[in-house]
């Protein structure tokens, strides 16, 4: 067959596949309830793609710290009551904050100002509800509040939240509670100060300063109502106030135009109305003027905002069309939805935002984003965005990261940041792989020199996480810094990504320096035990050593030696050699998955979930491990393990995620894996081939091309890959290059009942490792980047 003929046939096949999938809307398959139970920590409420406002119900805000873990997203599926609806939430985080500006509608004459007890109906403004009267769709949420006789509907634009409240009886007076005392992880003393004012035009504005996960966080709000106010009260419930000053007009009255304090709750009275009440809301981390501007940035009533946001979700989600059994279709569609919630817009419509220095800055020519859970999301979430979103999304992310470094009091890139404020959560300088991966894929629109300088600054900031010792010794010593084993290997990977970007930019001096540091993982590898271990300042490994032990602040970060023993993504081939070769590596991988945990107790470790032996899918350090068989010449074993993981860890139910979704990382893992490939090493420009879990998929790439993925004979009886074809040509290696994905066409898997042990088993067929002779995939040049989008 001639090349021209082969290309024409491939194009025709792609056209047929696209036609077959065109009727399948991914938007219609999404179920935002997935992950709202169990350990998923997702929320069901209304949000636009990457929206600043996440308008969602909170079922319990009174719990504190560790007791609050299950309510990190505000909502928990098995809770019997809803306390109210607040404007800010994390999706899938393992810690929490937010839950700002909680509102609750009430119909009737009794208007309590306290939330009450969930176990005592009628004791406060919280209300019982029934899941049968609850609806969650992308950009829309509704529920009937049984105790108040009110149907509440929520929708949201990028910077606007819209609520519509309808009383069961038009003769009942309607009220709205706004509780500025409420927050997620709402321990005593969290609310430092709050204010509220009723402006002459009827707009309600205010600000709140909190001390929570992010210290000294300021957030302002603005509200407008679709019906006139009949009355209001701004109440302070603060006790033991040492000095009250002088009362203003209406001494002692709560019907004042403004109030400030540490414990404020507001009541708005509308009287009996014969139509639904719509409440428009917006937030700003800058000031009240910013919130008011955001309030006006998206005109229209509830239905108009809902229609606009649903259209945005259709466009964002329908870049991927899938054909699969219904449970898998729902799981993958919802995974893509969850992957498009963060990093969230954090700048006002005029470009202003609050940075890590707590000062106001201006984003010119881009949208400032925040909510960076980088320890989680560098792995698959950010690589996924490069193939399902326009390049401007990743460009905005990089510009936001670099701007944050420029405004950081410490002069480094974000670690775990939200609303521009740093939390210092987790380890590593994982903004580096995010930036390097984007740059090497040809994404531009940012200052590459400033980005590289920011990466180097973060990797050489001695006070951070033992970096001073790391630069001096080549490892982080455990007797000077906790979680030293994890930090050593994660720093080494981040160093490799800096070297990769520097080399692509012609900065050979930086490339050589950080390329050498990329080998520092060897300093924590114990050849005797075959594990990554923590060393002391005297060079000895810390004892006693138990590879199954998990304790916070110990040698490892949210894991143990079994999980961290595999974290050398920049040079897995070298790790295979260090472990004794292919057979020894395969045996050790099998031992990990088949480990007997019956005598172990991890109940004290809240992030340890989704165990398959010592493989822990509910937390990120294990996410690449199933793909490592391919580095030892056994891709068929990767295929078997992936089937085991997907079938046990993902279900289309509220408790369908085995662990925290972590701002889209758990979900991005499933999207990639379902399509048949995964970015084990971001910034390598390669994806390791696994096996598909969908019969067909059509991916509309950001450059205008389409990649159609077909899995022939895919069913439970055919779990193994027999052959792989890309645009009619056999793929006999265990990886795909990024440029091959972006070129589009047809990727066809033929599945079979028995393993094809010969496929991609040769050493030359293995994915990239730094110590390999094979040349890595070349970075996408600027000219090609323009053509590829």
Predicted features along the sequence, with ranges:
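Bacterial N-terminal signal peptides that target proteins for export
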Residues: 1-10
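Bacterial N-terminal signal peptides
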Residues: 10-19
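Accessory carbohydrate-recognition regions in carbohydrate-active enzymes
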Residues: 24-433, 439-489, 497, 502-523, ...
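ATP-dependent phospho-/nucleotidyl transfer catalytic cores
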Residues: 494
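Extracellular attachment/recognition segments
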Residues: 720
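Long, low-complexity, intrinsically disordered segments
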Residues: 781-789
């Amino acid at each position: 067959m001639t090349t021209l003929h082969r290309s024409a046939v491939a194009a025709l096949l792609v056209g047929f596949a696209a036609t077959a999938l065109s009727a399948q809307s991914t938007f219609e398959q999404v179920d935002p309830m997935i992950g709202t139970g169990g350990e998923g920590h997702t929320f069901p409420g209304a949000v636009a793609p990457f929206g600043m406002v996440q308008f969602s119900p909170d079922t319990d805000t009174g719990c504190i710290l560790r007791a609050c873990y299950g309510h990190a997203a505000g909502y928990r599926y098995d809770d019997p009551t809803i306390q109210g609806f607040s404007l800010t939430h994390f999706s899938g985080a393992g810690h929490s904050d937010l839950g700002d500006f909680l509102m609750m509608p009430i119909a009737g004459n009794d208007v309590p100002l306290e939330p009450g007890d969930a176990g005592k109906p009628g004791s406060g403004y919280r209300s019982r509800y029934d899941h049968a009267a609850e609806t969650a769709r992308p950009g829309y949420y509704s529920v009937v509040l049984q105790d108040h006789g009110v149907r509440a509907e929520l929708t949201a634009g990028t910077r606007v939240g819209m609520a519509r409240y309808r009383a069961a009886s038009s003769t009942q007076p309607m009220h709205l509670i706004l509780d500025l005392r409420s927050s997620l992880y709402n321990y005593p003393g969290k609310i430092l100060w709050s204010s509220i004012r009723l402006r002459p035009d009827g707009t309600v504005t205010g600000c709140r300063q909190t001390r929570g996960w992010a210290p000294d966080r300021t957030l302002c709000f603005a509200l407008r109502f679709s019906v006139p106010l009949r009355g209001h009260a701004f109440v302070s419930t603060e006790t033991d106030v040492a000095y009250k000053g002088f009362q203003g007009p209406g001494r002692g009255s709560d019907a004042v135009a403004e109030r400030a304090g540490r414990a404020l709750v507001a009541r708005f009275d509308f009287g009996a109305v014969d139509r639904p009440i719509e409440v428009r809301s917006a937030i700003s981390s800058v000031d009240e003027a910013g919130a008011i501007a955001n309030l006006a940035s998206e005109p229209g009533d509830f239905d108009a905002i809902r229609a606009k946001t649903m259209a945005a979700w259709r466009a964002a989600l329908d870049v991927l069309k899938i054909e699969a059994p219904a449970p898998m279709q729902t799981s993958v569609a919802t995974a893509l939805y969850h992957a498009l919630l963060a990093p969230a817009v954090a700048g006002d419509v005029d470009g202003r935002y609050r940075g890590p220095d707590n000062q106001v800055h201006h984003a010119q020519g881009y949208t400032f984003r925040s909510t960076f859970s980088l320890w989680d999301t560098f792995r698959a979430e950010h690589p996924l965005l490069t193939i399902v979103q326009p390049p401007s999304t990743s460009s905005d992310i990089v510009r936001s990261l670099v701007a944050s470094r420029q405004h950081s009091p410490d002069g480094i890139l974000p670690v775990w940041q939200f609303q521009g404020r740093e939390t210092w959560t987790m380890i590593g300088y994982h903004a580096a792989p995010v930036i390097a991966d984007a740059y090497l894929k040809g994404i531009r629109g940012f200052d590459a020199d400033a980005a590289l300088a920011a990466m180097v600054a973060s990797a050489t900031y001695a006070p951070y996480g033992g970096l001073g010792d790391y630069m001096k010794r080549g490892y982080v010593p455990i007797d000077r810094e906790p979680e030293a084993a994890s930090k050593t290997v994660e720093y080494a990977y981040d160093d490799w990504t800096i070297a990769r970007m520097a080399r692509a930019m012609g900065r050979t001096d930086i490339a050589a320096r950080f390329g050498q540091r990329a080998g520092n993982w060897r300093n924590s590898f114990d050849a005797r035990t075959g594990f990554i271990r923590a060393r002391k300042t005297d060079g000895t490994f810390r004892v006693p050593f138990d590879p199954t032990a998990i304790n916070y602040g110990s040698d490892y970060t949210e894991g143990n030696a079994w999980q961290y023993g595999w974290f050398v993504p920049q040079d897995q081939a070298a790790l295979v050699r260090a472990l004794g070769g292919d057979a020894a590596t395969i045996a050790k991988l099998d031992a990990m998955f088949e480990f007997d945990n019956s005598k172990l107790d991890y109940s004290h470790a809240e992030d340890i979930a989704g165990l398959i032996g010592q493989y822990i899918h509910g937390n990120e350090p294990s996410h690449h491990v199933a793909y490592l068989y391919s580095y030892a010449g056994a891709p068929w074993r990767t295929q078997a393990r992936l089937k085991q993981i997907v079938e046990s860890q993902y279900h289309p139910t509220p408790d369908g995620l085995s662990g925290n979704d972590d701002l889209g990382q758990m979900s991005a893992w499933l999207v990639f894996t379902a399509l048949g490939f995964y970015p084990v090493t971001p910034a390598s420009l390669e994806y390791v081939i696994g096996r598909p879990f969908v019969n067909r998929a059509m991916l509309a790439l950001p450059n205008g091309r389409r990649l159609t993925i077909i899995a022939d004979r895919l069913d439970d009886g055919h779990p193994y890959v027999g052959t792989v074809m890309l645009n009619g040509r056999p793929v006999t290696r265990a990886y795909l290059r990024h440029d091959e994905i972006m070129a589009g066409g047809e990727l066809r898997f033929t599945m079979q009942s028995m393993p094809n042990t010969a496929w991609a088993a040769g050493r030359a067929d293995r994915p990239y490792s730094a110590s390999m002779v094979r040349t890595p995939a070349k970075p996408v040049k600027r000219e090609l980047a323009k053509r590829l989008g």
